[in-house]
């Protein structure tokens, strides 16, 4: 994902994962960190088997997250304390994690989504989580804005969303 120059593009503020922002910007946390989960349907695992390691994901159709610039999010996983990436291979890409989870429910492949989106599915058995010990915890969302000239309206938004 790219950093949006909110000043040049005339935005009052932006939202992104993690607190890394450009110089002259302030970042305010607005959501908790996210535990990511690799999930699929029972039928998917009957057909393809259960992956035991991240390397096994190449044998599975995977649902991708697509950024606004068209690039795909490479799944970030932990192996022996090191971050590795898995570029998802499959026919489906969505610019929305909710749609990724829905596609997984429909049996279109494995999805790598925030656990909070699929908690009910896991409890009901409609989705099964795999590779849990390899999953990453991603930093939550931050609202970022220029240090100068905070309008009363933006201040109200910041104060409401701040965690």
What are these regions (language model features)?
Residues 24-35, 40-65, 80:
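Flexible hinge/capping segments at coil-to-helix
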Residues 73-87, 121:
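Ligand-binding cleft/hinge of the Venus flytrap
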């Amino acid at each position: 994902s790219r950093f949006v120059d909110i000043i040049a593009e005339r935005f009052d503020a932006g939202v992104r994962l993690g607190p890394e922002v450009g110089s002259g910007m302030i970042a305010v946390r607005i959501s908790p960190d996210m535990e990511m989960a690799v999930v699929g349907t029972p039928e998917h695992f009957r057909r393809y088997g259960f992956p035991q390691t991240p390397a096994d994901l190449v044998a599975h159709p995977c649902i991708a997250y697509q950024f606004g610039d068209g690039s795909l999010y490479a799944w970030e996983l932990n192996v022996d304390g090191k971050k590795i990436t898995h570029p998802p291979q499959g026919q489906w890409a969505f610019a929305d994690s909710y749609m990724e989870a829905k596609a997984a429910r429909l049996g279109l492949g494995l999805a790598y989504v925030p656990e909070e989106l699929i908690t009910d599915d896991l409890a009901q058995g409609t989705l099964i989580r795999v590779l849990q010990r390899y999953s990453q915890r991603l930093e939550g969302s931050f609202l970022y804005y220029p240090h100068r000239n905070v309008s009363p309206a933006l201040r109200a938004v910041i104060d409401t969303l701040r965690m």
